[in-house]
Amino acid sequence: MKKAVVLSAVALLSGVCAVADESVLIDFAKLNADIMADKSGGMTHNRRTVLDYASLADTSYTDEQKALMRSSLAVAQWEVVLNSSARNPVAHAASRVIEAPVSEGAKSFAGERVLGVRVLFPTWDSNANAMIKPAFVIPAYEVMAQVDDQGNVQAPTEEEKASGKGRFEDGYGVVKNVGVLKSIAVNTYGMNYPHGLYVMMRDQDGEVHRYFMGYLLFDSWKELVWNNPSYISDVRSREVRLYPVYPASTPHVVFEGFMVTRDAAHAGGDYVGYFKDVKIIYDKAVLSTVRDFADEDLWGIQARREAERKRVEVARFGQQQVLRYIEQEKLATEVGFTPSGGAQRQEEQQ
């Protein structure tokens, strides 16, 4: 039997068993928009997950443009990215993500707000897929901090720093201290579509892995489960390796998004679905994360790496937001033609 490689730093003691744990990777019910109202009065961003890239933008951006470089994991901020065989102007405009309220009388998740998505797949014979993803790459290391009603991230307090918790942990897209994945579960509402569903995750090395959860050919809520076929329960059959603890990243997983696939043999057109959460069961990479030294406070290596990643992200996300703003400003606001004088008189006569 092929031995599984365990990414851990555990002591090699006889009789030690793998310690499994369960965590919610992302819970869309926590991602409701609750701050920063738009012109119509609707909230636009999720307080806990606001990221402001303006502080890292260069001087070529105006203050107005920098104000656009703020985003969050609020459900309405998520995007649908179609592959080349599915991408066309009509499909691009129709495919979108919304914050969907579950009815009060529902048997599951009554009254909660979840992620709802519509994808317009091609109707001709063509393999196609759609990625449902956040507007930005979820950061693995973002110190816990408070956010005010205007979306300004406050400086973390000493207590928040000492907690060791990140802003994107506890159901907001990041789970740390993950060794070997044992199982993944997705709560989704199906409507008898024959499409396949994948969960995409990024590990501590920046590699993105996809896990096939099954087909969406069912009606109502269902928990789709992926079980690791290479998972070995007996630690004596495992190959254990020791890795440097710092400054290497603690093994973790970050949610990258969903992928919905449409086979050319199946009917195309609209797909509509709903997602509540993603959960994982995993072996801990390290039995205890309590250390004698505050390594990151002393050396700041991971913080510098994260800052560099953010600067790269600004080049993509910030410019994209500015271009979208410019396009919005150029949109025609007229709903019809201004009538000429003769046409006006003719309408009055009628």
From Swiss-Prot:
GO terms for biological process: bacterial-type flagellum-dependent cell motility. Residues 1-20 form the signal peptide. It is found in: Periplasmic flagellum; Periplasm. Pfam families: FlaA. It comes from the Bacteria. InterPro entries: FlaA (IPR006714), FlaA_Spirochaetes (IPR016369). Keywords: Bacterial flagellum, Periplasm, Signal. Disulfide bonds: none annotated. One of its GO terms (cellular component) is outer membrane-bounded periplasmic space. Component of the outer layer of the flagella. The flagellum consists of an outer layer composed of repeating units of FlaA around a core that contains several antigenically related polypeptides. This is Flagellar filament outer layer protein. It comes from Treponema pallidum (strain Nichols).
